[in-house]
Amino acid sequence: MSDYIASALSRDEHFRIFAADATQTVREAQRRHDTWSASSAALGRTLVATALLAASGLKNADDMLTVRIKGDGPVGALVTDGTNVGTVRGYVEEPHVNLPLNLVGKIDVARAVGKRGLLAVTKDIGVGDPFTGQVPLVSGELAEDFTYYLAKSEQIPAAVGLSVFVNADNTIQVAGGFMLQALPGANDAELSELEANVKTLPLVSELLKSGLTPEQIIQRIAGDEPVQFLDAQPLKFACNCSKEHFGDIMATLPHAQLQEMIDQDGGAETTCKFCGNQYHYSVADLEALMARHE
């Protein structure tokens, strides 16, 4: 089944609820970057959060949202991009990190990411300069960190859940998440009731493994109150890199540097950090890039 994000309004449109099945998306990220369990969980959670933030905060097809997380844990930096059309991409600085399970028998994402560091979200909506909101990490588990970001940087009371189940062979069994946002008009009693529902909710990975859909997860969060479902959005890992794009960057290099690639290496090769795609440039390709300056 293809990945998607479901969304809905609840409580007289006082709340927005999003839920995502991102299993195939995170599987593709794991395959492309050959991530091990702790790195997979950290990158997967960040990709899911990025998809949810993009679905809730971007309006136009060309808008872009970028998440950068740098903690003091062994996975290093996490960088992800998301769009309003349901595509995400990203990478983790150190893909080969395995750690002992934490005290509750789960992948120790907090230790992998680190509890000291920063989470930054940049929105580029094509008007003016991109806007960046930044907060310190509060737990390293990431769901709590994104909840804190929404409260402090965007002034949105929210609850975020992120979950990736990694098999013993490092493959991804399921991945997904949810985001509850309070809208203008929401009162404290309503928020407290929904937060109570969230606190008793099993991990999203457990719900997905049991066969629940994103719509059913949303209903579990809403409780007995009716919900108004909005259009579902397909979700997938996709990168907009290309040989032409990297060629444009290489064309800005000094002639001497390009000539050195020709004379010493007989060409050049570059790898996209976000997706792992490799692009080869022959001598003829490099000569064509040099000719742009003439």
Curated annotation (Swiss-Prot):
Disulfide bonds join 239-241, 272-275. CDD domains: Hsp33 (cd00498). Keywords: Chaperone, Cytoplasm, Disulfide bond, Redox-active center, Stress response, Zinc. GO terms for biological process: protein refolding. GO terms for molecular function: protein folding chaperone; unfolded protein binding. It holds the Pfam family HSP33. It is found in: Cytoplasm. GO terms for cellular component: cytoplasm. Under oxidizing conditions two disulfide bonds are formed involving the reactive cysteines. Under reducing conditions zinc is bound to the reactive cysteines and the protein is inactive. InterPro entries: Heat_shock_Hsp33, Heat_shock_Hsp33_C, Heat_shock_Hsp33_N. Redox regulated molecular chaperone. Protects both thermally unfolding and oxidatively damaged proteins from irreversible aggregation. Plays an important role in the bacterial defense system toward oxidative stress. Belongs to the HSP33 family. This is 33 kDa chaperonin. It comes from Lacticaseibacillus casei (strain BL23). The lineage of its organism: Bacteria, Bacillati, Bacillota, Bacilli, Lactobacillales.
